Each structure stands twice: as C-alpha cells, then as structure tokens.
Amino acid sequence: MSTEAPARGLKSAAIALHALDKATDRCRECPLGERATQSVFGEGPVHARLMVVGEQPGDKEDLEGRPFVGPAGRLFDRAVAELGWSRERLYVTNAVKHFKYELRGKRRIHKTPAQREAAACLHWLESEIALVQPAALIALGGVAARSLLGRPVAVMSERGQWHQDAAGRQVLVTLHPSALLRGDPQQKEAAWKAWLADLSLASPAYEAVAGRQRESAAPPAGRAKRAARREPA
C-alpha cells in the first residue's frame, strides 16, 4: 500500500496546526491575550495516539512559548519517565492558550481561568483534537476536564476514571500536577503514587503508539517562540 496519501495527510495536518498556532497568538476573543507575552500552543507528533490537556500556560510557559516547561511541567516529565513513556510521543496542550495572572509586586501569580475564558478558547482546542485525531485524551484538572467533556467535573470524585466526550473519544480525568505542588507535604508521596496510578490507566493507549507508524512521517507540531516579555497592561 502506498504511503503517499498518509504522508500528504500528515503534512496537511502539520500545516494546519502551524496556522492555528499563529492564529492563537493574534486571538483577542477574551482579554487574556492582551496581557500575555504570547500564546502557548500544543506540541507533539501530528497524529499522536495520546493527547494530554492541561489548564493554561504558567509564567515560564508564557515566556518560553512551550507547554509544560515550568514546575508543574517538570513534575509531569518525571511522571512520564516513571511510567516508561516518552514525551516525544505525546501531544501536549492546554485548554486555555494564554497565561492568566495577577501582579503581586514584580511577580505574576497564576489565576484560574474563568469559564467564559475557557469557552472562548474551546474552538482552538477542538481544532487541535480534530487535526491530531488522538485515540484517547488525559484531562489534567477541572478546566481541562470541563472543556473536553462539556460539563462541570468534580475532579476528586471523578479522577482515575475514563469518560466519553461528545465524539465518543475516551477521556481520562485526573489532577493537574500543580495540585501536587500545592498539597500537604506530609501527604506528598501518597499523592504522587495516586497520581501515577491514575496516569497509568492510559498506558494501553500510549503503548498502541508503536503500531501507529504514521505519526513519525511528519515533524512534530510546535514552534520556537520569542522570549521577549510583553509589558503588562
């Protein structure tokens, strides 16, 4: 069977993702884009089997233009390593594409996006999903879970469970890694093990990556972003 058609499809998806990436940088459908340095789009194989969706970029992500590179991202990378996964085989993104924060002195402190802000970003996320076509998704935290499932999600009672989105895709709900950073230090080890147990439920979907060779036929989505900070409004 010829590989030309799948290769063309991958190239088209990569081009479309790149265009979406550029478009999110210009997005002003909510006020967050006015204050952020830049948008932070997803990155990973164009047709990754498993997509991981977080809440929003943090301070470091906002400056570097890449998802999950701050403290929560390092914790996520540690979990990926312990599970025997490779981040290069995951498509990682956020439900909200711009950093929401409040200034405290010279520090920019994370603020949870309002539902209207997440809703304004939903079409970007839906477009990513349509192009990447993951078999399964992991929702890290309540904002991501609500965006994917279209309803409020009680993360603590629904974590470690598979749910179906409107298109019938499987969505695993668990905590955002930042919740582990804020948690009770005495419970940190137990919380870590419980989080790993949640994530491990997605291992069958991850392991199926090896049989989906077409993901390696195109370069990963994502781009090198500028590092200059936009002055806060």
Q: Model-flagged regions — what are they?
A:
Residues 2-233:
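A polyanion-binding, active-site-adjacent surface
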